[in-house]
Amino acid sequence: MENLLSVENAILITGPTASGKSALAVELAKRHNGAVVNADSMQVYDTLRVLTARPSEEEMQGVPHHLYGHVPAWAGYSTGAWLRDVSALLPALRAAGQLPVFVGGTGLYFKALTGGLSDMPDIPEALREELRRRLVEEGTDALYAELSDVDPAMAAGLNRQDGQRIVRALEVTKATGRSIADFQGRSGPVVIDADEARKIVVLPDRAVLHARINGRFEKMLQQGAEDEVKALLALGLPAEAPVMKAIGVSQIAAMLKGEMTRDEVLEKGAAATRQYAKRQMTWFRNQMDDSWQRLTH
């Protein structure tokens, strides 16, 4: 681990699910008087602590952790929202003399963190809430039809069932009178200078990773994932809500309805996690350049 000790303004750690990156983040944070900052798009939600593998109090080992479970399950949350939360958090960490240790499996978060993000306009909260309410009550087809009327070019490029992107495009059009496409080419400020950060991508051997995934999903069921999904389903969220797409939700929901056995949930949940990890590994290999240290952990 000695070659990981030379750092400047931040440590960035990414890798597939179940790769051991969260434990590495805690280890390095302890060495550098650091604070761990979540960079996983599912671990921001408050409802699914177990199912999204948010670190437990024991796993945190007394190290400060930020941006975990701070978003209600019903709320929309984007890469831009995460970047704004990070920008608001960093001054406090700097003032406390704490090194930010970013960790998570959402590659787009790291791209935005070090490369900037499209400079989108501010959206009035009332408008945002209205469109999300309409998404639940009216469904994606109605909002897609509305977007087709006001911004047909953008609508043509979207999946008509992608409620989150449809709502986002409508938000911008209604708030500004302009297409979201007008803003997507404008890049906002870089939050972390990639040249002044230690960057690590954890890429375990596939057999090791699969063994961890298989054991982890069973442990999640033992630790209360079923109760979490019950609580989530009780909220009555639309199927296209991001939190509803967390791996394990559909499988456990099927078990609760009597449509799947516990053994089938274990098999299908682990299989879905392995497929997700494979997609992550491919993305990291293709998107993370040689400035990212490859680490088997």
Curated annotation (Swiss-Prot):
Site annotation (Interaction with substrate tRNA): which residues? T106, R128
Cofactors per UniProt? Mg(2+)
Q: How does it assemble?
A: Monomer.
Q: Which Pfam families does this one have? A: IPPT
- Region (Interaction with substrate tRNA) residue spans: 40-43, 164-168
At the highest ranks, the source species' classification is: Bacteria, Pseudomonadati, Pseudomonadota, Alphaproteobacteria, Hyphomicrobiales
List, alphabetically, the SUPFAM superfamilies matched: P-loop containing nucleoside triphosphate hydrolases
Please write the reaction equations for the catalytic activity of this protein.
adenosine(37) in tRNA + dimethylallyl diphosphate = N(6)-dimethylallyladenosine(37) in tRNA + diphosphate
- Tell me which species this is from: Rhizobium etli (strain ATCC 51251 / DSM 11541 / JCM 21823 / NBRC 15573 / CFN 42)
KW Nucleotide-binding (keyword) present: yes
Write down what this protein is called. Answer: tRNA dimethylallyltransferase
Keywords from UniProt, A to Z, are: ATP-binding, Magnesium, Nucleotide-binding, Transferase, tRNA processing
- Per the UniProt record, which EC number(s) apply here? 2.5.1.75
Q: Provide the GO biological process annotations.
A: tRNA modification
Ligand binding (substrate):
T17, A18, S19, G20, K21, S22
TM helices/strands, residue ranges: none
